[in-house]
Amino acid sequence: MLNNCVVLIRKSVLLSPNLKYIRNMSIDIGGMRIKYKEKDETFLEKHLVSKEPFGQFKSWFEEACARKEILEPNAMCLATVSQEGFPSARFVLCKGYGKEGFKFYTNYGSKKAKDIEGNPNVAATFYWEILNRSVRIEGRVEKLSEDDSTKYFHTRPVVSQIAACASYQSTPIESRDVLCEREKLLEQQYMIPGKEVPKPSYWGGYLLIPRSVEFWQGQRDRLHDRIKFRRPNKGEVSDERLLHEGEDGWVFERLSP
């Protein structure tokens, strides 16, 4: 019966007068837009709470955390590039930040980790829609110490620790049942009070060390505000007109939207 239904569906599609449209379908969504902030809600240099990017990030991040509509304010889209020059992006969770950089954890056998091994230059973006704000980070990544990775691993829920052991991230798998069977076996082994799940050697953390951090705030008239912190080029001097002296070796500038 199922095969007959599939045949009928295929025939109906093939005989459809709209088949040409279906094959060449192009949807125009150019008119989709939302209103951002009002003209009196601009993000100016005088509004910076810090003259270095980490203090400014802390301020914006805490505002995002305070908004219950933002379920995962620490989610960031991480972009990597393979040795062949092909980019890819995915969301990861930032698990710590400070003047040294931004921390995230993953499987060292994953696509992102293989990209990083061949090319440690990455970009990451936080986007908080309800605030009409984003933060763009460009820099390089380094592996965190094994001790750091192990300490964080054991702060995770046990089910998450087991999932990390059960999944060989980014490798093809026959079915979800295979994963579930691995998980079941690991649960039988480790879901025992007082028994610790060992961190897999292929799992750990990275530190994203920024070269630049850009703060973007959307404006209703599309003249968006962009203030970028970056490390100065060799011999570059701040003129306090276009380029401003920051703190801790940073400079900042306003960019056209």
From Swiss-Prot:
It catalyses: pyridoxamine 5'-phosphate + O2 + H2O = pyridoxal 5'-phosphate + H2O2 + NH4(+); pyridoxine 5'-phosphate + O2 = pyridoxal 5'-phosphate + H2O2. GO terms for biological process: instar larval development; pyridoxal phosphate biosynthetic process; pyridoxine biosynthetic process; pyridoxine metabolic process; regulation of transcription by RNA polymerase II; response to hormone. Its EC number is 1.4.3.5. Expressed in silk gland and fat body of the larva. Disruption phenotype: RNAi-mediated knockdown of this protein causes significant decrease in transcription levels of pyridoxal 5'-phosphate (PLP)-dependent enzymes phosphoserine aminotransferase (PSAT) and aspartate aminotransferase (glutamic-oxaloacetic transaminase) in silk gland, fat body and midgut of the fifth instar larva. Induction: Expression is up-regulated by exogenous molting hormone (beta-ecdysterone) and down-regulated by exogenous juvenile hormone (JH) III in the silk gland and fat body of the fifth instar larva. Binds 1 FMN per subunit. Pathway: Cofactor metabolism; pyridoxal 5'-phosphate salvage; pyridoxal 5'-phosphate from pyridoxamine 5'-phosphate: step 1/1; Cofactor metabolism; pyridoxal 5'-phosphate salvage; pyridoxal 5'-phosphate from pyridoxine 5'-phosphate: step 1/1. Homodimer. Belongs to the pyridoxamine 5'-phosphate oxidase family. This is Pyridoxine/pyridoxamine 5'-phosphate oxidase.
